[in-house]
């Protein structure tokens, strides 16, 4: 085993019909409710800012974002009506990203998920940790910044300027991670510092080459990816 996750996509493995039955997730443990819910939020946000977004994917992505923000906390705390709505939200997010594709949050989650001896970083947990840092990185691109601000504005978050709206969006994600008991940094998750330093250069190379990187709204080099991972490990500001 290489310790590397590879995303696979092909029409030969695409189902003709999806049965979206909320009864299937009634018994889901709270931790998995949190991780899969934040994965759905990441799917929707990345689809909305993707270079391949369009008029067919934008409404699906925005509706999914709104539903996750509205229903995930209650679903996490055991409300079955909210869990049903989350089940629909993840489907809408899936429809959005299946057509608009994703970005480097997923690239990074794919390539760190099985990389460390500490244990597997569950995909949704990784996405939740990485998302606010990637928003900060991508928001240095004017088009991406406008899209993130649009999300915040439509979700009724505070702010007038784009910068203030983006701050509110990141703060909302941080707030949700706190409520869902998701770590804010890789260090807090428990990744050992010496192993992180040893592996992060090669992980960064792999992440840049991931299939999801091509539709990210801002280009990234292996050196920039390594800097971004360092911000996520130590919880430092993304200022580049």
Predicted regions and their residues:
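Glycine-rich phosphate/pyrophosphate-binding beta-alpha loops
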Residues: 91-127, 210-215
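Short coil/turn segments at secondary-structure boundaries
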Residues: 81, 164, 187-190, 215-223
């Amino acid at each position: 085993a290489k310790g590397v996750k590879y995303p696979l996509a092909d029409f030969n493995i695409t189902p003709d019909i999806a049965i979206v039955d909320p009864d299937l997730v009634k018994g889901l443990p709270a931790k998995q409710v949190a991780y899969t819910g934040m994965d759905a939020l990441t799917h929707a946000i990345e689809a909305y800012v993707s270079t391949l977004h369009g008029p067919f994917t934008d409404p699906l992505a925005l509706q999914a974002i709104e539903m996750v923000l509205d229903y995930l906390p209650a679903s996490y705390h055991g409300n079955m009506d909210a869990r049903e709505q989350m089940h629909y939200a993840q489907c809408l997010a899936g429809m959005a990203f299946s057509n608009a594709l994703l970005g480097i949050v997923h690239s990074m989650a794919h390539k760190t998920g099985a990389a460390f001896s500490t244990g597997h970083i569950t995909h949704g947990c990784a996405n939740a940790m990485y998302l606010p840092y990637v928003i900060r990185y991508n928001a240095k691109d004017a088009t991406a910044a406008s899209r993130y601000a649009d999300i915040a504005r439509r979700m009724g978050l505070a702010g007038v300027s784009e910068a203030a709206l983006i701050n509110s969006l990141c703060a909302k994600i941080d707030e949700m991670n706190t409520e869902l008991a998701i770590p804010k940094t890789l260090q807090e998750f428990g990744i050992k510092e010496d192993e992180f330093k040893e592996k992060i250069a090669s992980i960064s190379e792999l992440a840049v080459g991931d299939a999801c990187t091509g539709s990210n709204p801002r280009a990234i080099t292996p050196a920039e990816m390594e800097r971004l991972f360092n911000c996520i490990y130590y919880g430092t500001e993304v200022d580049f």
